[in-house]
Design a protein with these regions (language model features):
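Domain-level signature for soluble enzymes in the chorismate/prephenate branch of the shikimate pathway
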Residues: 1-221
Length: 221
């Protein structure tokens, strides 16, 4: 091994130690935030989306997926500090994204189909994950479920290996700057979902229901 290569590796090792120290400091601060929130919502998908969008924009020389992957794990670990008892009902086609998004910190319930996901939520699961392609079924379900809301679409950037997934929770997503509104209605051929740019306040009208206002998806790698 040349002296130059040895020096470079030593520098990388030092950087790794510094990164780890910063991660530990971040976790301490996350615990302080939890104490200051005094019982507020543990999971804030809007806040996460805005943080990731800011970080991706501040590092245009890095792949967006790299930034999102790193902070996804940090944010999930921080959420688990406040509440590690969340239960996630996961459609079988969303299992890969569930593992990526929640990192194994929470209990997951594998579900074969939409009906199984609905039952798991009826039985008390906190969050449900449905893959893209289930929009009609999701719209029909949430039209009659005032207590459930779409709170996110994940991953927040395009991925060649992970299919996009809808996330459903029991509280509306926290507001962010860049948003889109999801409206469910009965169409000519059955339930359908409309995605509207921005925030639509108030009732959708015509038997429709706003089933979620979520962060707009950001940059694609």
């Amino acid at each position: 091994m040349t002296d130059k290569l040895s020096e470079l590796r030593q520098t990388i090792n030092q950087l790794d130690d510094e990164i780890l120290a910063l991660v530990r400091r971040r976790m301490v601060l996350a615990a302080d935030v939890i104490a200051a929130k005094n019982g507020g919502a543990a999971y804030r998908p809007g806040r996460e989306a805005e943080v990731m969008a800011r970080l991706v924009a501040s590092a245009p020389d890095l792949p967006a997926g790299l930034v999102v992957n790193l902070w996804r794990q940090l944010m999930t670990a921080s959420t688990a500090l406040q509440s590690d008892s969340m239960t996630i009902a996961v459609h079988r086609d969303a299992m890969a994204v569930a593992g990526w998004h929640f990192g194994g910190f929470f209990t997951t319930i594998g579900c074969d189909d939409l009906a199984s996901v609905r039952q798991a939520m009826a039985d008390g699961a906190d969050i449900a994950l449905l893959p893209a392609g289930c929009e009609a079924g999701m719209a029909g379900w949430l039209l009659g479920e005032e207590g459930l809301h779409v709170i996110a679409r994940t991953p927040p950037v395009g991925s060649s290996t992970l299919l996009p997934v809808w996330m459903i929770g029991r509280q509306p997503a926290d507001p962010v700057t860049e948003e889109c509104t999801l409206v469910a209605r009965q169409g000519t051929n059955g339930p359908e979902l409309e995605v509207v740019s921005g925030r639509l306040d108030g009732a959708a009208g015509g038997g429709a229901r706003v089933i979620g206002v979520i962060a707009s998806n950001g940059k694609t790698d």
